[in-house]
């Protein structure tokens, strides 16, 4: 998975069934809701199936059509232009210093946080209950069923070629 950050299996392999201290297998069903190990196991399952990448692509395809994104983009353009207008051009100046100064100004202004929250409200929130949650619940259900099946020992196969014992006929 090449998602540009945070991809990978995320511990969905055999390590997801062991404690981080190298202990024995963990039964996810025995962990309480909210347990960090359970959360890590579930997140690993979601990552290994590409669900986060799918959500990211879905949201990214939708984001630039939203007014909050367009508004934030315009404000960012204006902020950068204003910041650069205040800078004195110095050819030997390090571009990284200019980038860092701009980044610090954006963070200190606090404008981007509110804009990102509005974008999230317009893009992510509508998809949360109707698209994302059902997919997450389905994967969790499949994972827990597989864990339960793996925890139940298989019944020995019935011997072939033997007739089952005849039912006793009590004539009393």
From Swiss-Prot:
It is found in: Cytoplasm, Cytoskeleton, Microtubule organizing center, Centrosome; Chromosome, Centromere, Kinetochore. The gene is BOD1L2. Residues 154-172 have a biased composition (Pro residues). The keyword Cytoplasm applies. May play a role in proper chromosome biorientation through the detection or correction of syntelic attachments in mitotic spindles. Pfam families: COMPASS-Shg1. It comes from the Eukaryota. This is Biorientation of chromosomes in cell division protein 1-like 2. Residues 1-13 have a biased composition (Gly residues). InterPro entries: BOD1/SHG1_dom (IPR055264), BOD1L1 (IPR043244). The lineage of its organism: Eukaryota, Metazoa, Chordata, Craniata, Vertebrata. It comes from Homo sapiens. Residues 1-35, 151-172 are annotated as: Disordered. One of its GO terms (biological process) is cell division. GO terms for cellular component: centrosome; cytoplasm; kinetochore. PANTHER family: BIORIENTATION OF CHROMOSOMES IN CELL DIVISION 1 LIKE 1. Belongs to the BOD1 family. Keywords: Cell cycle, Cell division, Centromere, Chromosome, Cytoplasm, Cytoskeleton, Kinetochore, Mitosis.
């Amino acid at each position: 998975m090449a998602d540009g950050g945070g991809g990978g299996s995320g511990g969905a392999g055999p390590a997801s069934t062991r404690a981080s201290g190298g202990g024995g297998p963990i039964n996810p069903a025995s962990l309480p809701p909210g347990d960090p190990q359970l959360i890590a196991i579930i997140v690993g399952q979601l990552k290994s199936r590409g669900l986060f990448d799918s959500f990211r692509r879905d949201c990214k395809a939708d984001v630039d059509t939203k007014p909050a994104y367009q508004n934030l983009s315009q404000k960012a353009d204006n902020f950068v232009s204003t910041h650069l207008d205040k800078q004195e051009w110095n050819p030997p100046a390090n571009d990284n210093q200019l980038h860092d100064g701009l980044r610090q100004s954006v963070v200190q202004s606090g404008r981007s946080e509110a804009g990102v929250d509005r974008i999230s409200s317009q893009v992510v929130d509508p998809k949360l209950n109707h698209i994302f949650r059902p997919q997450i619940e389905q994967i969790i259900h499949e994972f827990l069923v597989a864990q339960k099946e793996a925890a139940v020992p298989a019944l020995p196969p019935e011997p072939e070629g033997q007739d089952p014992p005849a039912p006793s006929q009590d004539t009393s």
